[in-house]
Amino acid sequence: HPFSVPIIPRNQEEAAEERPPLEGVNLIGAVQGSAGSDRIIVVTAHYDHVGIRDGEIYNGADDNASGVATALALAQHLSRSRNQPKHTFLFVFPDGEEHGLSGARGFLADPPLPVDTLAFNLNFDMLARADNGQLWASGAHHMPALLPLIEEVAAEAPIDLRSGYDGSDEAQDDWTTQSDHAVFYRNQIPHLYLGVEDHPDYHQPTDDFENIDQDTFLRNVDTAIMVAKAIDDQLEALLGLPPLEAPTEN
């Protein structure tokens, strides 16, 4: 899914410059739902990072190889026949998140499916660290119906899953515009963002595999899968719509 989008200027100087558009390629795949619904759950996890700075490679193990790996683990889980979801899951791996969310902007500017079928966005960005043992679900402030779902999953999750960083607490940063889910939010598509708090290796060349606690990461992946399945099960209730009718057998 190639895209070309305008650069968003950060100040008046940049706004006055003529700059070429940002170009990139999003990667897209899908797992078909079983219920025949045209409502699609879009899972996003950006695959780009900041690249090379001053001759040093920034590998981005947490930001965001961890999110990509989580999305792939979810896709693998749902692709097994016994785990087939009710709704179709569209897996989008945006390019250019580190450059003005350009991949997500390009996806919604030219989606492969009608925008009105994109019912929900679940975004994975930085799930490997949780140095304090906490995984955050950001978005319930904008969709209060998500809070009981998060609490329900948290009660069974293998990690300390918490709701916040979405404008609900003035003492916390607001992550609503901090990753690809922001583009869905601006297009009135409900979202939930799973991620961890910043850590000393964030956007540093030390964000490497060796600094990831594997046990914590795997527990975060398991929790993310639980969240995705809960959204699939409860999507109509979250959206205030009638429940899906059970598919009839021919």
Where are these regions (language model features)?
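Sec-exported extracytoplasmic/periplasmic mature domains
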Residues: 1, 73-83, 109-113, 151, ...
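A non-catalytic alpha/beta surface segment that caps or lines the substrate-entry region
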Residues: 1-31
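Second-shell loop/turn segments in exported
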Residues: 12-18, 54-64, 93-94, 132-141, ...
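Stable alpha-helical elements in mature extracytoplasmic
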Residues: 27, 39, 64-70, 74, ...
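Alpha-helical metal-binding/catalytic segments enriched in His/Glu/Asp
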Residues: 27-29, 43-101, 224
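Proline/glycine-enriched tight loop/beta-turn segments at coil->beta junctions
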Residues: 33-40
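Metal-dependent peptidase/peptidase-like ectodomains
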Residues: 36, 94-193, 197
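His/Asp/Glu-rich mid-to-C-terminal helical/loop segments that flank catalytic regions of hydrolases
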Residues: 199-250
